[in-house]
């Protein structure tokens, strides 16, 4: 049976991950630790014999720079890359820039958990005159006003990620190309929910660690057979738990 592999990598720790702030579409860069995580992911992929024909990432530099570091370790810096806003992190609306623990102290752990992980729950909206509104950013100049979010739930994130998967990424895989995607916690959760047919309750509890390669294997009909992280299982579990705890009051 022919098996096709897909590699997903959430960006390494960003400066705002480190500061425990809601990031969303804000274009913050990797922390030193995040760069190290990205390089380690690349080394791990090389050790496991992976190489690629094409890469996808978002238009946010924490994902782009993660991909650069991964490809550098693989000696595949030449690889063609498509960047799309459809792989961006979920837009966190008016929460962007706020400290997660302080927000939990103000609104309660459960409210923040729902804002972070609830399937159809949207954080408070931005206004269009807010400097954080993506309509002010030249990288989104070609998007219609309807496409520019004021806030997003995971459900709304799925609405942009899955058509991009089906229309753009999957056909390339079906043509025989080996693909890697470097993206974000929630754009990857959107894809994982779809691939694994997870319920809304199941996705609520899913936390994807930074900078750890997640491998999906597909059968000849491009149905997922299995998935697994590369690396030390205990370390990966600890990183996922740390992601879950970011939204709790101290």
From Swiss-Prot:
InterPro entries associated with the record: His_Pase_superF_clade-1, His_PPase_superfam, PG/BPGM_mutase_AS, Phosphogly_mut1
Superkingdom assignment: Bacteria
Active site feature: 11, 89
UniProt KW keywords: Gluconeogenesis, Glycolysis, Isomerase
Gene Ontology BP annotations: gluconeogenesis; glycolytic process
Short name of one Pfam family: His_Phos_1
Keyword Metal-binding: no
Residues annotated for substrate binding in this entry: 10-17, 23-24, 62, 89-92, 100, 116-117, 185-186
SMART domains: PGAM
PROSITE patterns xrefs: PG_MUTASE
CDD domains for this protein: HP_PGM_like
Entry EC number(s): 5.4.2.11
Coiled coil regions, renumbered to chain: none
Recorded GO MF terms: phosphoglycerate mutase activity
Catalytic activity field: (2R)-2-phosphoglycerate = (2R)-3-phosphoglycerate
Protein's pathway: Carbohydrate degradation; glycolysis; pyruvate from D-glyceraldehyde 3-phosphate: step 3/5
Family annotation (PANTHER family): PHOSPHOGLYCERATE MUTASE (PTHR11931)
Subunit-level organization: Homodimer.
Family to which this protein belongs: Belongs to the phosphoglycerate mutase family. BPG-dependent PGAM subfamily.
Function: Catalyzes the interconversion of 2-phosphoglycerate and 3-phosphoglycerate.
Protein name, as recorded: 2,3-bisphosphoglycerate-dependent phosphoglycerate mutase
Species whose genome carries this gene: Salmonella typhi
């Amino acid at each position: 049976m022919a098996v096709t592999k897909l590699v997903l990598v959430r960006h390494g720790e960003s400066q705002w991950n480190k500061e425990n702030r809601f990031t969303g579409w804000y274009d913050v860069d990797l922390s030193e630790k995040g760069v190290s995580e990205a390089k380690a992911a690349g080394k791990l992929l090389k050790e496991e014999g992976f190489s690629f024909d094409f890469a996808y990432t978002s238009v946010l530099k924490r994902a782009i720079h993660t991909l650069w570091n991964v490809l550098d370790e693989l000696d595949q810096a030449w690889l063609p890359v498509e960047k799309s806003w459809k792989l961006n992190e979920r837009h966190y609306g008016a929460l962007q820039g706020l400290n997660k623990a302080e927000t939990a102290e103000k609104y309660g752990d459960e409210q923040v958990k729902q804002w972070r992980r609830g399937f159809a729950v949207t954080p408070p909206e931005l206004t269009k005159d807010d400097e954080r509104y993506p309509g002010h950013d030249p990288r989104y100049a070609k998007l219609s006003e309807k496409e520019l979010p004021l806030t997003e739930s995971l459900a709304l994130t799925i609405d942009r990620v899955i058509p991009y998967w089906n229309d753009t990424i999957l056909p390339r895989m079906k043509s025989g190309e080996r693909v890697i995607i470097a993206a974000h916690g929630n754009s990857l959760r959107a894809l994982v929910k779809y691939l694994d047919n997870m319920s809304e309750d199941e996705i609520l509890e899913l936390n994807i660690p930074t900078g750890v390669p997640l491998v999906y294997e597909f059968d000849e009909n491009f149905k997922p057979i299995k998935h697994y992280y590369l690396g030390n299982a205990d370390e990966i579990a600890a990183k996922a738990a740390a992601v879950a705890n970011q939204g709790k009051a101290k």
